[in-house]
């Protein structure tokens, strides 16, 4: 297991994030025998999957959803769900013993004479290179549109969606043709008056 960085130590790489992208980067950094550290804002392993809606499921089987080095364990039926993915990421992280500090919120990255300094509220770290693997879940993009201030109903992003029961019997418009939009629409259409809007013809439904 790689040891944590000491105060003032110059690392080869600092990775900001702790989800699957960060873990994949860490795998190859470890193989290259570089000194590195992951700084994760989450309380525990799993990245954005820890915040996914309850029925969130991958669109691909375990064998096609693995990250480098260690295959995702198979599921008994269907495709992996949220909890299975979180468990896999927890086991993956422990398997390789990556050095991770959490929870830590990064406030700035700045250049120094030696390389780059990564700042948090309580501590600084230094490295020759910094990789951002923070994803987009914590800052979802809610598009602006004319008349948005006139809408009196509820508007949320898929990042805030949790359970379909909150929309039972309501009129719901799901906007977006990606996997999230397709999966949420399929679930809501069973209990709500749901309509799905996409910019182009969707290829398939879950």
Regions found by a protein language model. Give the residues of each.
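Short, Lys/Arg-enriched N-terminal segments with co-localized hydrophobic residues
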Residues: 1-3
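N-terminal Rossmann-like FAD-binding beta1-loop-alpha1 element of flavoenzymes
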Residues: 8-38, 181-189
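Glycine-rich active-site loop/strand segments that organize a redox cofactor
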Residues: 47-87, 196-206
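A Rossmann-like FAD-binding core segment of flavoenzymes
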Residues: 104, 108, 189-206
């Amino acid at each position: 297991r790689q040891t944590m960085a000491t105060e003032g130590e110059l690392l080869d790489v600092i990775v900001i994030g702790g989800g699957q992208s960060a873990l994949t980067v860490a795998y190859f950094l470890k193989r290259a025998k570089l000194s590195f550290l992951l700084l994760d804002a989450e309380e525990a392993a799993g990245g954005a999957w820890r915040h996914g809606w309850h029925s969130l499921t991958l669109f691909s089987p375990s064998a096609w959803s693995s990250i480098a080095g260690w295959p995702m364990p198979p599921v008994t039926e269907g495709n992996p769900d949220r909890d299975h993915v979180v468990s896999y990421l927890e086991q993956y992280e422990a398997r390789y013993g990556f050095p991770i500090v959490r929870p830590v919120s990064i406030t700035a990255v700045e250049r120094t004479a030696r390389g780059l300094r990564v700042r948090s509220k309580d501590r600084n770290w230094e490295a020759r290179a910094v990789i951002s693997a923070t994803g987009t879940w914590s800052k979802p993009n809610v598009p602006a549109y004319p008349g948005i201030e006139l809408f009196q109903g509820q508007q949320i992003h898929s990042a805030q969606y949790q359970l379909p029961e909150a929309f039972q019997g309501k009129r719901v418009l799901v906007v977006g043709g990606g996997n999230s939009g397709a999966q949420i629409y399929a679930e809501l259409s069973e209990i709500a008056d749901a309509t799905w809007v996409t910019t182009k013809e969707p290829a398939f439904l879950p």
